[in-house]
């Protein structure tokens, strides 16, 4: 599994349909920019509001377009273990390289329940499983000790860590060095990716890289190579854009940003709505200041 920067990509819409022409151009833009991986149908890809048929079509389209150049990882999380297994099996049948599985939301399982959830999924699929911890969205936090229990299952290969808790990340890094050093830890927060990699993490699964892929790749590569001065310089330059992309619920701002770059409309599906006037102003200025939009 990759080290570096992977994009959690948008899903472009045209009216109420998937805009495959824009998706094709967008995936090419990502690949040409040197991105290290693509996460399709995650939070940023508006997975909750695509139909089962659309899911299959989107996965097949992305796998074919990428053609093995980078890993294609599909979001298959659910608060039903059986449903997540079904989605994960389908993703692998359609050619995915891995699945990204968010912790179950709303029903708030215990740490034992979380372990059994991931264990059941991992045992049901032939490929890589990545845990996704984002308690701000799910209402549940998978703690480092539980993550490391999961890491002892061979095909659970890493975690997208978006708790926002650096102490928790540090504890995870400390523990994994003893249990399974090759287990990957990616930041799920763009504004903390530099710090996570400097602490020994493996990269970022990024929203920022939807609009600044080459810069994100360069920043993470520099940090992984130990060129902290270069990585810090890029991080600080991009920091206002990182913040701008989250002034409203993701993916509202980034959908507007990719629209400005020419990758389809800014259409989102309800209950998400288009960016406010203030968000548009802030995002556009941040893009211009960072040099990603002229």
UniProtKB/Swiss-Prot annotation:
Gene: dapA
GO (cellular component) term, any one: cytosol
Lineage: Bacteria, Thermotogati, Thermotogota, Thermotogae, Kosmotogales
Chain's role: Catalyzes the condensation of (S)-aspartate-beta-semialdehyde [(S)-ASA] and pyruvate to 4-hydroxy-tetrahydrodipicolinate (HTPA).
Keyword Lyase recorded: yes
Keyword Cytoplasm: yes
Protein name listed in UniProt: 4-hydroxy-tetrahydrodipicolinate synthase
Catalytic activity: L-aspartate 4-semialdehyde + pyruvate = (2S,4S)-4-hydroxy-2,3,4,5-tetrahydrodipicolinate + H2O + H(+)
Record GO biological process: diaminopimelate biosynthetic process; lysine biosynthetic process via diaminopimelate
Organism: Kosmotoga olearia (strain ATCC BAA-1733 / DSM 21960 / TBF 19.5.1)
Pfam families: DHDPS (PF00701)
UniProt-listed SUPFAM superfamilies: Aldolase
Location(s), subcellular: Cytoplasm
PANTHER family: 4-HYDROXY-2-OXOGLUTARATE ALDOLASE, MITOCHONDRIAL, DIHYDRODIPICOLINATE SYNTHASE
Pathway entry: Amino-acid biosynthesis; L-lysine biosynthesis via DAP pathway; (S)-tetrahydrodipicolinate from L-aspartate: step 3/4
Enzyme class, broadest EC rank: lyase
E.C. number(s) listed in UniProt: 4.3.3.7
Keywords: Amino-acid biosynthesis, Cytoplasm, Diaminopimelate biosynthesis, Lyase, Lysine biosynthesis, Schiff base
Subunit structure: Homotetramer; dimer of dimers.
Domain of life: Bacteria
Family: Belongs to the DapA family.
